[in-house]
Amino acid sequence: MNTLDEDHKALDALVLIDEPTFPGCIIHARPIGLFKMFEEEGPDHKLICIPVEDPRWNKIFNLHQVDAGLVKEIELFLTAYARFEDHKMDLEGWEDQNSALEIVREAQARYWELHSETVNPDYSSLNPR
């Protein structure tokens, strides 16, 4: 929430959950990695997150801890998604949790700068370690 990626759209996030949801559903989640994509307007980062409240994921802190088959499935989904876009998109690949956290911080700063609100957000909740 309250993020702008470099293309000035909200930062995209995919949350790994087992239960169905609905559009507009808010899930308290933390990033564990990201998939870097570039389109004509600039970077189009896709955060990969896990739900904070789900005990099945509470020992996962980085993307390399997730089943390799699931990571490959996500990559194939994002690759197929990129093919259906109306413009050229370059796929850069996976980055770790530290990169994801940095992208979130930058996107939040960009959002608040654009909205001229002065805040000093506390990012400690993004990294539970």
Q: Over which residues does each language-model region extend?
A:
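Hydrophobic N-terminal alpha-helices or hydrophobic patches in metabolic proteins across all domains
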Residues: 2-129
